[in-house]
Amino acid sequence: MSRVLVPCHVKGSVALQVGDVRTSQGRPGVLVIDVTFPSVAPFELQEITFKNYYTAFLSIRVRQYTSAHTPAKWVTCLRDYCLMPDPHSEEGAQEYVSLFKHQMLCDMARISELRLILRQPSPLWLSFTVEELQIYQQGPKSPSVTFPKWLSHPVPCEQPALLREGLPDPSRVSSEVQQMWALTEMIRASHTSARIGRFDVDGCYDLNLLSYT
């Protein structure tokens, strides 16, 4: 299935503080990144790709357009998706990730805004985010191909049987061929291999056929 890159604007991340902000132990454990689509009408999201950078868990909320008279509402479509099996180790910390619409918890149609919620509970990493974020929608469908009627509607199995009625019986043809072969062998066996001389007639020479030099 084809896909088309959707132009978007990724806003700066907003950190939500974990712990006492008045002490050195307070640190951002949650980041919120909003993505808008100022030049695109509400669309059906097909795929999200990005490169992880030490984010342990990802949640996604989408804002879906309903109508001009109803305000768009936020819906959670992905909740605590694991990007690092162990937040305290390097595994998965810098992997490329692709998320498809069939993995989402809700319908991904009429999307007007996207919100990424990043979590990293481990104190080992100084910073975390996602990079190279790209949003895709479904591309135009391929034009339908028209097949000939004889190809799209196969001939029923009964019709070839009717066509065979006009053909000779294979066993009869085989028998006649064998008879012709036997007759040919008989003629070949009875044919003399003696050479006939140019002027030899019944073992004698015909004087009228001889030429004088």
Curated annotation (Swiss-Prot):
Reported tissue expression: High expression level is found in brain, testis, liver and kidney. Weak expression in spleen, leukocytes, small intestine and colon.
Any one annotated GO CC term: microtubule
Keyword Nucleus: yes
Localisation per UniProt entry: Nucleus
InterPro entries to which the protein is assigned, alphabetical: Nicolin-1 (IPR040235)
Keyword tags: Microtubule, Nucleus
Predominant location: nucleus
Subunit record text: Part of the neuronal tubulin polyglutamylase complex which contains TPGS1, TPGS2, TTLL1, LRRC49 and NICN1.
Protein name: Nicolin-1
Gene: NICN1
